[in-house]
A protein has these predicted regions:
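Inter-lobe coupling linker of SF2 helicases/translocases
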Residues: 1-56, 68, 75, 80-82
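Conserved helicase motor "Helicase C" RecA-like lobe of SF1/SF2 P-loop NTPases
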Residues: 89-114
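Conserved helicase core region in the C-terminal RecA-like lobe
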Residues: 93, 137-144, 161-163
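Phosphate- and divalent-cation-binding pockets in alpha/beta enzyme and binding domains
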Residues: 94-98, 149, 167
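Conserved helicase ATPase core of P-loop NTP-dependent helicases/translocases
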Residues: 108-142
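A short beta-strand element within the Helicase C-terminal
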Residues: 148-161
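Conserved SF2 helicase motif VI
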Residues: 164-175
């Protein structure tokens, strides 16, 4: 039980409370309203999770056009002005769907960062995001939650939550 839900093999030596100079982290939990009945939204969420976990055919594509998370994200980007936002989600397919759905809603300079890009293209997109006048939003698949640090980003959006708590820590640790 401890290995599954506790720190297990992860040791937390350098926590924010033990080190100085880090800004305080504030979690913003946002309940989202949906046009559909709760049962319809629940079915959509279950299908999305099944697809993310590889339980459904790759033929089924995400359709996030009317997803309340996209509506909220568009509003958030408008409210934040020029602040840099890092968004992390589970899969390449979801990254591309978020990019398409968001482009229909709000004009924003957004880069993508996922497994199907070459290493050079990922580096270019990360560099564009790092530039002062570059992308305001970087939409990453799970590959963006490991290895790279985006400390210059002002906000982190977790479009979905990983089932593994260590992966959640990895995502949060990008900023």
């Amino acid at each position: 039980l401890l290995d599954r839900h506790g720190p297990g093999r992860v040791v937390f030596r350098n926590t924010r409370s033990a080190m100085s100079g880090f800004p305080k982290r504030v979690a913003h939990l946002v309940p989202l309203a949906t046009e559909n009945a709760p049962s319809t939204w629940r079915k959509q969420a279950e299908r999305e999770l099944a697809f993310d976990l590889g339980d459904m055919e790759a033929v089924e594509r995400y359709n996030l056009t009317k997803d309340p998370r996209i509506v909220w994200l568009g509003q958030l980007l408008e409210e934040l002005g020029e602040a840099k936002v890092l968004l992390i989600c589970r899969s390449t397919e979801k990254v591309l769907s978020i990019e398409r759905a968001l482009a229909r809603q709000v004009p924003v300079k957004a880069g993508v960062f996922h497994e199907d890009l070459t290493l050079v293209q990922r580096d270019r997109n990360a560099a564009w995001f790092a530039e002062q006048d570059g992308a305001r939003l970087l939409i990453c698949s799970e590959i963006g939650s490991e290895g790279r640090n985006f400390q210059f980003a002002h906000h982190l959006v977790l479009f979905d939550l990983p089932l593994n708590p260590e992966l959640l820590e990895q995502r949060i640790g990008r900023l």
